[in-house]
């Protein structure tokens, strides 16, 4: 349903929201002046050389916006978010005329206005102002080539190395460089698209329906309203395989068998557990697209079609639970959304909590607490580096005009957000009751965008006895302090159920750090039943104790080939870091191979830091590896690695 149209049974007289008054300093648009009922994209993709000029790679076509004027006084222009890389060549306006079936679209004037380094305003002028509640249609003809929202990959950046690939990444404010829009999470709308591709290519989108129309055209429709940042497109040499009653995997042909094997049958279990906890899964399908190895992120929760790194193909299903995080966004983030990027914790803190609830049910409390302990360690690391008092270490971040919301991204909304949701559950004191509350919260605010105030008002209404106790102003734990004071969370959930997994890992790491190895004691510990996060925890402890006494790392690798020869990316990263910290040169080739196989930022940068902080041989390895892999990395990652390998001024 478009924003403003409410389905029966979803609290028909819906509460007024604090978010209705909220500003979004990251949008140049006049999104409060219009309701966006529908967007249609009709685009043709061309794979040519990069750069301007005839025949260069690009997407070209039209964007059609169906709008209703919300201004009581009417409006004389529409202002949209756009970007200098988006070349708009024509604008037309179609207005309702009494008795006319479909009035013709008439050309209208338009101009751009500077806004910030990440976008500009596109202003469409109406010859006569539109009236309050009037419906109108704006048609924009445009082309986009090189830019931050549309990522073009050469064949060598893909897994198959044969054909080029293109994908879009919208979060947080990049879709204004893909199509002109209200680029704010405050606005939700339905969309459709018709995408024309060259021979031998397939298009996929974050949409509820995917339909082939002729040999080279694909039609998509999203039946639920979503914010602009969740519209996503990918075009490449793609095939699919069913892995569940409402799920399929998409990948390049050379990856499809591995993807099917890894995810066959498991996604449905995650979805069904989420539905039991948080209510119906409203998006119809849940498909996964395995991106080319140069995709710099772990996952992006585009509805109906999550984009994920091929690093999740571990060969032993050990990283399948990473998908639980993206699935949890189906309720928290995609269904109930932060109204601006300063409230990002509403998307991510709740998603971390939901992920860990699903994980507790499927894998047990000990395992989930161990995973949460690794998350807490990341938060500690982040706060140690930035300083606790850094204003980014608040849940409610004040984003100043001109600041790209992406530049405020860090662990705080995830892990401090998780702690706040855990604290609210702790106040309730009963897990079943809090689960029921979360289901009610999703139902209350589905398809809407909210602020923390909307959520907290609802929480205190739902639990009147807590409201009566004034739990919002308990000294040291005030809701206001949680939101607006930087620093370490005032409350930490108890992770002691994880001790049964953490203690043995710590004790084993201690044995391996000894000058004289006690192989009898070491061999008495069977690590074959350990799950991934227990091994990760063990390797993190080894890394902290490194460099180990001479010969110990070689012996460690020989004793546990399942670690030193792992296919699992989380283990490969840590084994690489250990090898470099201990200058264990006979395994340096494994570091090089891992960096040749993938380009995920989270794995790539720490290994370059470790190489440049290591021996001369390690530093040479860094320079050689970068020289031979730079062409297959994402441009942002190239810039970051460049700064590590050859810092400016060195």
UniProtKB/Swiss-Prot annotation:
Membrane-traversing stretches: none
Reported cofactor(s): Zn(2+)
Compartments, record wording: Secreted
Positions of post-translational Phosphoserine modification: 7
A cellular component term, taken from the record's GO annotations: extracellular space
CDD domains: M1_LTA4H
Stretches assigned to coiled coil: none
PROSITE patterns: ZINC_PROTEASE
CC cofactor note: Binds 1 zinc ion per subunit.
Reaction it catalyzes: Release of N-terminal Arg and Lys from oligopeptides when P1' is not Pro. Also acts on arylamides of Arg and Lys
Enzyme's top EC category: hydrolase
Broad class of the protein's primary localization: secreted
Sequence positions that bind Zn(2+): 325, 329, 348
Active site feature: 326
MF term (GO), any: epoxide hydrolase activity
EC number: 3.4.11.6
Domain of life of the native organism: Eukaryota
GO biological process: proteolysis
Protein function: Exopeptidase which selectively removes arginine and/or lysine residues from the N-terminus of several peptide substrates including Arg(0)-Leu-enkephalin, Arg(0)-Met-enkephalin and Arg(-1)-Lys(0)-somatostatin-14. Can hydrolyze leukotriene A4 (LTA-4) into leukotriene B4 (LTB-4).
UniProt record similarity statement: Belongs to the peptidase M1 family.
Protein name in UniProt: Aminopeptidase B
Organism the protein comes from: Homo sapiens (Human)
Gene: RNPEP
């Amino acid at each position: 349903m478009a924003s403003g149209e409410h389905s029966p049974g979803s609290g028909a007289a819906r509460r007024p929201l604090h978010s209705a008054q909220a500003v979004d300093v990251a949008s140049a648009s006049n999104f409060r002046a219009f309701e966006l009922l529908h967007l249609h994209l009709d685009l043709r993709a061309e794979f040519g050389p990069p750069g301007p000029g005839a025949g260069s790679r690009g997407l070209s076509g039209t964007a059609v916006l169906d709008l209703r004027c919300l201004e009581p006084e009417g409006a004389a222009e529409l202002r949209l978010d756009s970007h200098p890389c988006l070349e708009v060549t024509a604008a037309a306006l179609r207005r309702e005329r009494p008795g006319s079936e479909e009035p013709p679209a008439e050309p209208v004037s338009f101009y751009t206005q500077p806004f910030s380094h990440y976008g500009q305003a596109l202003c469409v002028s109406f010859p006569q102002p539109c009236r309050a509640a009037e419906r109108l249609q704006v048609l924009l003809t445009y082309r986009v080539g090189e830019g931050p929202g549309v990522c073009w990959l050469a064949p060598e950046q893909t897994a198959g190395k044969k054909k080029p690939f293109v994908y879009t990444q919208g979060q947080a404010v990049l879709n204004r460089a893909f199509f002109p829009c209200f680029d704010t999470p405050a606005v939700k709308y339905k969309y459709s698209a018709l995408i024309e591709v060259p021979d031998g290519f397939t298009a996929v989108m974050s949409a509820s329906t995917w339909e082939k129309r002729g040999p080279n055209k694909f039609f998509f429709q999203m039946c639920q309203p979503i914010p602009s940042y969740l519209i996503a497109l990918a075009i490449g040499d793609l095939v699919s395989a069913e892995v569940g009653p409402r799920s399929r995997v998409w990948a390049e042909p050379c990856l499809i068998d591995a993807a099917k094997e890894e995810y066959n049958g498991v996604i449905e279990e995650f979805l069904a557990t989420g539905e039991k906890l948080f209510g119906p899964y409203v998006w119809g399908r849940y498909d996964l697209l395995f991106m080319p190895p140069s995709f710099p992120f772990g996952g992006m929760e585009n509805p109906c079609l999550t984009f994920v790194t091929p690093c999740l193909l571990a060969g032993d299903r050990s990283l399948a639970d990473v998908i639980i995080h993206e699935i949890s966004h189906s309720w928290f983030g995609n269904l109930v959304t932060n109204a601006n990027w300063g409230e990002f914790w509403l998307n991510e803190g709740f998603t971390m909590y939901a992920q860990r609830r699903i994980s507790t049910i499927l894998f047990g409390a000990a395992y989930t607490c161990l995973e949460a302990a690794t998350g807490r360690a990341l938060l500690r690391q982040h706060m140690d580096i930035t300083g606790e008092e850094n204003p980014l270490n608040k849940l409610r971040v004040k984003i100043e005009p001109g600041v790209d919301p992406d530049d405020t991204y860090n662990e705080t909304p995830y892990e401090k957000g998780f702690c706040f949701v855990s604290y609210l559950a702790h106040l309730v004191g009963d897990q079943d009751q809090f689960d029921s509350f979360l289901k009610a919260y999703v139902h209350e605010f589905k398809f809407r965008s909210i602020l923390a105030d909307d959520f907290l008002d609802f929480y205190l209404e739902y639990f009147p006895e807590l409201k009566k106790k004034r739990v919002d102003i308990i000294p040291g734990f005030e809701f206001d302090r949680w939101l607006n004071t930087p620093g370490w969370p005032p409350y930490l959930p108890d992770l002691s159920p994880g001790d049964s997994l953490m203690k043995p890992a710590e004790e084993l790491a201690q044995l391996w750090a000894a000058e004289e190895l006690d192989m009898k004691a070491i061999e008495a510990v069977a690590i074959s039943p350990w799950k991934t996060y227990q091994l990760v925890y063990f390797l993190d402890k080894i890394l902290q104790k490194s460099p180990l006494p001479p010969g110990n790392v070689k012996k460690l690798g020989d004793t546990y080939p399942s670690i030193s020869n792992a296919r699992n990316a989380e283990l490969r990263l840590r084994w690489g870091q250990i090898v470099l910290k201990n200058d264990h040169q006979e395994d340096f080739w494994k570091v090089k191979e891992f960096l040749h196989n993938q380009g995920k930022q989270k794995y790539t940068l720490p290994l370059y830091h470790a190489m440049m902080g290591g021996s001369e041989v390690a530093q040479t390895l860094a320079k050689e590896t970068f020289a031979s892999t730079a062409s297959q990395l994402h441009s942002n990652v190239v810039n970051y690695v460049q700064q590590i390998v050859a810092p400016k001024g060195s």
